[in-house]
């Protein structure tokens, strides 16, 4: 239920911003505030989530319900109504089923591969199945009058690079946070609250700095900010690699969370700008949906790889050092994902979107 709800609300929220504010300083500022509010919620969630688990884990799922109700009522009251479309559009159920099926099968295959073997018939057959389902999705989108994803939008170099960077940015962080949580709670014996407080500085920096990123977007452009942000985040992961069984928080962990906070503040807002600049108003929801799908799929994909690497490298004796060795190997996955994001953003687009006359100029501004 939460996943379906997020699939409806996240792209809609981004679309409301991009269709309400014109490209340029106003939209950049709005997206910076959007990033800051998300980071604030993330930071507070770490702390309050830890507190609530001290009462009982069910409270972690119950408390968001009244908060969501208040947000819904506020949205009905404050968000301006958009004009209804002049024509109704069919929903592409086959496209949604094939795309979702391909992503689920890929993640499942990566999770199960260490147990059944990377070259086993089951693993190879599943990968062939992923390719076949993706082929069916592309065929469907090319041959239906109401596609889930208009494939022509992928001619936008800025949008494609932003989505690749989103996958690696969020994926690397999800994988890193997974390993850090296991490290702190299993090896160091920290509570959920202590773990949340340990990670809190990163989210706090994002919440404080994100509203101030808009002027930097106008001065340096989104590509440079995204590359700088992802470089800082990846450097933070590298600093965490030598972590030991008794490493101090202040010197061995805090620098990573500070760099991650600075990096997210620099990269997240510009990613939203790069993914939506130059897109026609009627496709802002599609662009937002693609970006949020990239965030979520990247998180699931990298986490699956992290889990596979962790399980493959944990020693059989179950000693603390054996667990630590597995954590070190898994952290390399996040480093690699971060580097891939930097590489993706430094590649120049081959083609630009041709659906609207003004798009070429818009994408040059985004770069």
For every predicted segment, state its role.
Residues 85, 347-367:
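Intrinsic disorder in cytosolic terminal tails and internal cytosolic loops
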Residues 57-59, 118, 190:
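Signature tryptophan residues that serve as conserved aromatic anchors
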Residues 13, 121-129, 133, 139-317, ...:
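12-transmembrane solute porter fold
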Residues 36, 40-55, 104, 108, ...:
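A gly/Pro-rich, aromatic-decorated transmembrane alpha-helix motif that marks the paired
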Residues 1-94, 281, 285:
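Helix-loop-helix hairpins in multi-pass membrane proteins, especially solute transporters
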């Amino acid at each position: 239920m939460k996943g379906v709800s997020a699939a409806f609300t996240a792209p809609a929220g981004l679309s409301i911003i991009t269709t309400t504010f014109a490209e340029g300083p106003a939209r950049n500022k709005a997206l910076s505030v959007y990033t800051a509010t998300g980071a604030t919620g993330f930071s507070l969630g770490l702390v309050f989530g830890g507190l609530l688990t001290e009462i009982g884990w069910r409270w972690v799922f119950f408390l968001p319900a009244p908060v969501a109700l208040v947000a819904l009522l506020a949205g009905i009251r404050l968000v301006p109504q958009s004009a209804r479309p002049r024509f109704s559009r069919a929903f592409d159920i086959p496209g949604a089923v094939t795309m979702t099926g391909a992503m689920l099968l890929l993640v499942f295959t990566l999770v199960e591969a260490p147990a059944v073997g990377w070259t086993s018939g089951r693993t190879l057959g599943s990968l062939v199945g992923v390719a076949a389902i993706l082929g069916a999705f592309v065929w469907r989108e090319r041959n239906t009058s109401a596609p889930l994803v208009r494939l022509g939008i992928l001619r936008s170099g800025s949008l494609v690079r932003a989505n690749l960077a989103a996958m690696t940015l969020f994926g690397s962080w999800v994988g890193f946070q997974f390993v850090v949580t296991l490290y702190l709670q299993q090896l160091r014996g920290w509570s959920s609250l202590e773990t949340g407080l340990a990670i809190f500085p990163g989210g706090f920096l994002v919440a404080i700095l994100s509203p101030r990123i808009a002027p930097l977007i106008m001065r340096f452009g989104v590509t440079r900010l995204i590359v700088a942000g992802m470089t800082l985040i990846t450097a933070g992961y590298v600093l965490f690699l030598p972590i030991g069984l008794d490493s101090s928080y202040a010197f061995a962990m805090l620098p990573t969370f500070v760099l991650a906070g600075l990096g997210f503040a620099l990269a997240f807002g510009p990613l939203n700008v790069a993914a939506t600049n130059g897109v026609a108003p009627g496709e802002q929801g599609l662009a937002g949906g693609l970006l949020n799908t990239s965030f979520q799929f990247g998180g699931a994909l990298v986490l699956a790889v992290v889990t596979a690497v962790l399980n493959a490298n944990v020693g059989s004796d179950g000693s603390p050092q054996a667990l630590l060795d597995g954590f070190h190997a898994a952290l390399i996955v996040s480093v690699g994902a971060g580097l891939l994001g930097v590489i993706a953003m430094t590649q120049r687009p081959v083609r630009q979107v041709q659906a609207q006359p003004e798009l070429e100029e818009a994408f040059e501004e985004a770069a």
